Amino acid sequence: GGTPSAIDSSLIVSMVEALKNKFSFSKDVEITIECNPGTLTDEKASDYIRCGINRISFGLQSTDNKVLKMLGRIHTYEDFIQSLDIARRAGFTNISADIMSALPGQSVNDYTNTLNTVAELGLQHVSAYSLIVEEDTHLYEHLKDYPPLPDEDDERNMYHVTEDILAGAGFHRYEISNYAKPGYESRHNKSYWELTDYIGL
């Protein structure tokens, strides 16, 4: 979680190798790293693959650069595409992207465009989250400074559009906000729902 791709990859490699020295890893272990588009380099991606990281997840959020700027994201959609290419060149074949709906000023058409674009990228997994404005957060305190949030009808339509477009692209929903191609369901996500044991480090 967080943005581990922001730090030197040697630290990630040393951490994974330390864990391998302390624990027995299954031969088909799934190790995921979260990346902020724009922070991934060829060197980092190669280091991740070399130490056994075999799944990468990008916090894309939207394909609309205006939306990304409004959200205060440091990346553009073009940065994401570049990071996606880097990941694939390094050898990643299990790639996920996070997108968001019900954002300030976001129309159903805006969100549909993002979904259609993401569905055509050849990803194995998509996490589609609906914005929830929590009290005592920066967004809650400054909501008046943003465009209006979508109404309930639009938010409901965004939910249905997510189902329709991703299903049409071969994804199935296996958890509340997560969609995967067959065989690419996140083991980390599934472990929560199946109440399996895990260690938080």
PLM-predicted stretches and their roles:
Residues G1-L201:
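C-terminal scaffold of the Radical SAM
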